[in-house]
Each structure stands twice: as structure tokens, then as C-alpha cells.
Amino acid sequence: MFDSSALNNALVRWAEKKNLAGVSAAIMSRDGLVYSFNYGWRDAACTLPVNNDTMFGIASMSKSLTALCACILASEGRLDLDAPVCDFLPSFSVAGQPPEAVTVRHLAMHTSGIPPMEPLEWSIAMNSTGRPENEWLTEMKRTAPNPMATIDEVIDYVAHCGYTTLGAPGEIMSYSNEGYAIL
């Protein structure tokens, strides 16, 4: 067994040094929860403490998990990374390219040719609840061409919005939130 108080103290020092509002950490084993640590607040008023059920947005960390899942499926023979995305999502395409040009690998490696876009920001703005109204939120709601509430609405936008691609699939790497939303 490890000294949980030493780990607790180290995590508190780290959270304070980083000026973090709230932190949750856990160690799991095959048998279940071995250790949990919660620090700080889950609301701006500092009235609700972080607990084991607090949900944190993991944002772009989900890209690593998505890529890992795709690689596991590929290693098990359940996913071909070089399969066209349109095999799974028939309405998907990238401007100026045949539908079968973009593969799962292209999306995973940020090489689909899709330029930086706003659909995920629109989706966050249109589908989040409880966010205080601010200039960014107002502008996102004003400019969103559709609610972006489903993957089909994101795909429809990517397929038909008339953007210029950065290059052919596989040519240029450009970080793509939309690519991972589709993946």
C-alpha cells in the first residue's frame, strides 16, 4: 500500500502552484477504485467542492483517446485505418476531393486537408447550458449556420460550406477539431 497522504500533499502543492480551481485524480485497478483525490471548487462562486462525480471537460485530450481506440480496433482487425471515411459516414466528403479520398488515418493524423473551422465552437455555443452570456458566445450563436447538435450537422457543414482545402489528403498536417469530431 502507498502513502496516500504524501500523494494528497503533493497534489495540493501542484494544484496551488498552478492556481487550479479544481482537480480530481484517481487510481484504478482491475478490482476498482484504489485512490481518489479531489481539490477545489466546481463552480465560480466556490460553493460546490469537487467530488468523485465532478465532470471535467477534457477537450483535446479526447483526441489521444480517440486515436488510441482507433489503433486498438485496427490491431484487432476491426478497423482499417486506410478505409475511406465515407465507408462509415456516407455523407462525408472534403471540398474538391472525391468522397473516398479521405481515410480514417487522414483524420487521425490531421492530414485530411480540412482547414481550421468553427463548427465545434458553434456546437459548444449552441448546445451548452448554464454558460454566462459573453461576446464570444453571442457571436458564435449569431454566426452558426445550423445548431451543430449532431455529427450529421457537422458533416453537412464540412461537406458543403465551400472552403478551400489546405491540400490533398495526406499532403499537409493541420490540427483539426472537426476531423476528430467526425472520427
What are these regions (language model features)?
Residues 24, 39-40, 79:
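N-terminal cofactor/phosphate-binding cores enriched in small/glycine residues
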Residues 1-30, 132, 158, 166:
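Beta-lactamase-like hydrolase cores
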Residues 22-24, 36, 55:
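A common structural microfeature
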Residues 31, 107, 183:
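Conserved hydrophobic/aromatic pocket- or pore-lining residues that grip, position, or stack substrates
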Residues 32-33, 78:
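Residue-level signal for well-ordered, solvent-exposed loop/turn and beta-edge residues enriched
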